[in-house]
Swiss-Prot record:
Its main location: membrane. Together with LptE, is involved in the assembly of lipopolysaccharide (LPS) at the surface of the outer membrane. This is LPS-assembly protein LptD. InterPro entries: LipoPS_assembly_LptD, LptD, LptD_C, OstA-like_N. It is found in: Cell outer membrane.
């Protein structure tokens, strides 16, 4: 029998049309909003979990206010009663009911669909044996239903699903899970879940949480967000243990104060140290963002003096206009061992100082201006570092005729020191530069000359070799050239392009005695391959070395047919034509260490990187780093590194590191890292983590042991203590905040370095 098709128009069948539309219109938003917040999943989970099937297609051709009914049999009695039977489909513009039978009664203002009933819209799929819709009180009831939130991968059952225009949505005898059907590793069972109209939170009553059919905990009353908007409430706790803190439990409480700012208050209980309070306040506007962190631990139980311990930090970045920016980083802590003992989300336990700055910056095509206050919080018994209070920098550049460029770099700084007996200084510097840069596809050339004039006013210099007033003027000239030669070649059977790129630089800087100038912001740089052509041996301006030198270097690349670098080798060295007279830069040889760099993409899975500096005077390696990586995917990699420094502050450094991430079974991942001090024959850090990640839950177990750098009462640093810890994290996706399974990979790979610099 050919199915009958009936299209109902408001003019012809107004009451029947009205009976169907309120049902759709009133439940669409509450159900959609509920599923969005409760079922939010990570990107990883959405990739691995099967999504509920939804075959509904929006009927775009139906205008608003019109429904379409298709059935095998249709009976209409006196415009008061309509009955449909056999493969009944009731469709409006964006929803559909399919049933064996359906009745529309004008007298009772009810629509009843029975027999294998299914309701679908783009977000929701419901199956039952009966749907009752009453348009008089705007109420829909679906008994013994199975529901699926199709776009957000959640599902459950309800003894009764009720949608009421005034009371909202109510599910009685309801279960909820984001696990695949038949594989409900976790499940929430509640007497009721209600969502009131125009409210952003729902309420579950008498809720039991089951894992593998075992009840884990019970909540008589649970309020949860039903929109994607931020909501005030408890976040997932963090549990861990370490030799420094003992057992530690953190319970964050989130405060949604305003769309543009929020706060998190986190009590942290540590069995060894007591109760700590951590607070975080964030704000974000169209042009500004910032964060305030305050941590306070009263009467540290593990301290011999039961001292109060604290940490604070304020950061801000903002745009005052299109050209003006401001940045702030202000911080402090109670003692040198705070980070070592209590940890930090912002600093490393090996840090020797905290950097503070307040900056105002102006940027344009020709002029850049920067005004900064720079200070340091020194940890331990280290020499007090000079702070710039303030430092003004101005850079101006303009094009001249015939390809020439003219730029001026200038600075004005006031240097102070927390140590009241150290010298202080005001420094002014200006350096005009005239250059001729030429560049094309086969090479480049640069001719540059500059004059560097610096003036100092130094104070508190009694008992030193410094002079009160110093004026220093130096001239500098540079010639730099590079060529690029190419040829077609074969590389392991593939057609490639090989380049040969020789480069040379001559640099001359005049000499002036600088022994009467203090060191305020100057430290020595080491020369890797790129540093050979830098022309600058020190940071800052307090020491500018005299130079009469030639730098030679060469680079060769292998480029495949897809224009990707497969191999790059660089060699370079500085040849000193005269000895340096500036004491801090004096050389014992007529040439620098030979610097080499190697990057090699070995096939599609192996990557290698190496840097080495070899002294031509002793034929010994001064510095080296070697890295080899095997990578199949983002979470499937193995990397081994070795770092060597012959003389770093009087000590030789030789360290071996191993970093790995590998899936060991379906949904199971392992990450680890290990660093060993070869000279001292000891492991300085070990980290291992095991993670199970499915679409609906995740388990992460991490163990770590690392060398700590504690300071004694005299500020002297000890590197013989270790801190061990273990942490366990259990996440049930869909009942609160979730983070991707990559978090453990990110933490485990902290310190991982990209092993190559190929383009």
């Amino acid at each position: 029998m050919k199915p009958l098709k009936l299209e109902l128009n408001p003019r012809d069948f107004n009451h029947y049309q009205a009976a169907f539309l309120p049902y759709r219109m009133k439940i669409k938003q509450p159900l959609h909003v509920l599923c969005f917040s409760v079922c939010s999943l990570s990107a990883v989970a959405q990739e691995t979990c099967p999504a509920p099937a939804n075959t509904f297609v929006v009927e775009k051709r139906l205008p608003n206010g019109q429904i379409q009914v298709i059935s095998n049999m249709t009976s209409i009695q006196q415009d008061n009663f309509a009955e449909f039977e056999g493969d009944v489909e009731i469709t409006n513009k964006d929803s559909q009911i399919i049933a064996n039978k359906a009745q529309i009664d004008r007298t009772t203002q009810q629509l009843i669909a029975t027999g294998d009933v299914s309701y679908q819209n783009p977000q929701l799929s419901v199956t039952s044996q009966k749907v009752l819709l009453n348009t008089q009180n705007n109420r829909m009831e679906i008994a013994d239903t199975q529901y699926e939130l199709t776009t957000l991968n959640a599902r459950g059952q309800a003894e009764l699903l009720v949608v009421d225009q005034t009371q909202g949505l109510e599910l009685n005898g309801v279960t909820f899970s984001t696990c695949p059907t038949g594989q409900e590793d976790w499940l929430v069972h509640a007497d009721s879940i209600t969502v009131k109209p125009d409210e952003t939170r729902g309420v579950a009553r008498n809720a039991f949480f089951y894992v593998q059919d075992i009840p884990i905990f019970y909540l008589p009353y649970y309020s949860f967000p039903v929109t994607d908007a931020r909501e005030t409430g408890l976040l997932f706790p963090q549990v861990g243990s370490s030799s420094s803190t003992g057992f530690a439990y953190e319970q964050p409480y989130y405060l949604n104060l305003d769309p543009q700012y929020d706060a998190t208050i986190t009590p942290r209980y540590m069995t060894k140290r007591g109760l700590q309070l951590k607070t975080e306040f964030r704000y974000l506007t169209e042009n500004n963002s910032g964060q305030i962190d305050i941590e306070y631990l009263p009467n540290d139980s593990d301290s011999t003096t039961n001292e109060d311990r604290y940490f604070y930090r304020f950061t801000h970045k903002g745009a005052l206009s299109d050209d003006w920016e401001v940045n702030v980083d202000f911080n402090g802590l109670s003692d040198d061992n705070y980070i070592v003992d209590l940890g930090s989300d912002y600093y490393n336990s090996a840090d020797t100082h905290l950097f503070r700055t307040l900056g105002l910056h102006y940027y344009s095509d020709a002029l850049n201006v920067s005004l900064q206050l720079r200070d340091f919080e020194i940890l331990g018994d280290h020499d007090d570092t000079y702070r710039a209070l303030p430092e003004l920098k101005l850079d101006y550049v303009t094009d001249l005729p015939a390809g020439f460029k003219f730029d001026i770099h200038s600075e004005l700084a006031r240097f102070d020191n927390a140590n009241g007996t150290s010298p202080k200084a005001t420094r002014a510097h200006i350096a005009p530069t005239l250059s001729l840069p030429l560049e094309n596809s086969w090479g480049e050339f640069l001719a540059e000359t500059s004059i560097m004039h610096t003036v100092y006013r130094q104070e508190d210099i009694e008992g030193t070799d410094l002079s009160r007033d110093v004026s220093r003027t130096l001239g500098q000239a540079k010639l730099y050239g590079a060529l690029v030669f190419e040829r077609q070649a074969h590389w392991f059977g593939d057609n490639v392009t090989q380049t040969l790129e020789p480069r040379a630089q001559y640099l001359y800087t005049s000499y002036e005695d600088q022994s009467d100038i203090g060191l305020y912001d100057t430290t020595r740089l080491f020369n890797d391959f790129a540093g050979l052509f830098r022309g600058q041996e020190f940071t800052g301006l307090d020491r500018i070395s005299d130079k009469n030198q030639v730098t030679l270097g060469v680079t060769s690349r292998i480029i495949d047919e897809d224009n990707r670098e497969q191999f790059k080798l660089s060699l370079g060295q500085i040849f000193y034509l005269e000895d340096n007279k500036v004491t801090a830069a004096s050389k014992e040889d007529d040439r620098s260490a030979l610097a080499a760099e190697l990057d090699w993409r070995i096939g599609s899975k192996w990557l290698a990187h190496s840097e080495v500096q070899v002294s031509t005077q002793t034929d010994k390696v001064e510095r080296s780093s070697v890295g080899l990586e095997y990578r199949l995917a983002r979470d499937k990699m193995l990397q081994i590194n070795h770092r060597f420094v012959r003389d770093l502050s009087g000590e030789q450094i030789s360290q071996l590191g191993l970093t790995a991430s590998w899936p060991i079974a379906q949904d199971w991942y392992w990450v680890g890292r290990w660093y060993r001090d070869i000279d001292r024959h000891r492991t300085i850090e070990s980290y291992t983590g095991l993670q199970y990640e499915s679409c609906c839950w995740a388990l992460r177990i991490v163990a770590q042991r690392q060398l700590t750098s504690r300071f004694d009462d005299d500020g002297l640093q000890s590197t013989d203590e270790f801190d061990s810890g273990i942490a366990i994290q259990f996440l049930f996706k869909g009942i609160g905040g979730d983070s991707s399974g990559r978090d453990m990979l990110r933490d485990g790979l902290f310190g991982y370095r990209q092993p190559y610099l190929l383009d």
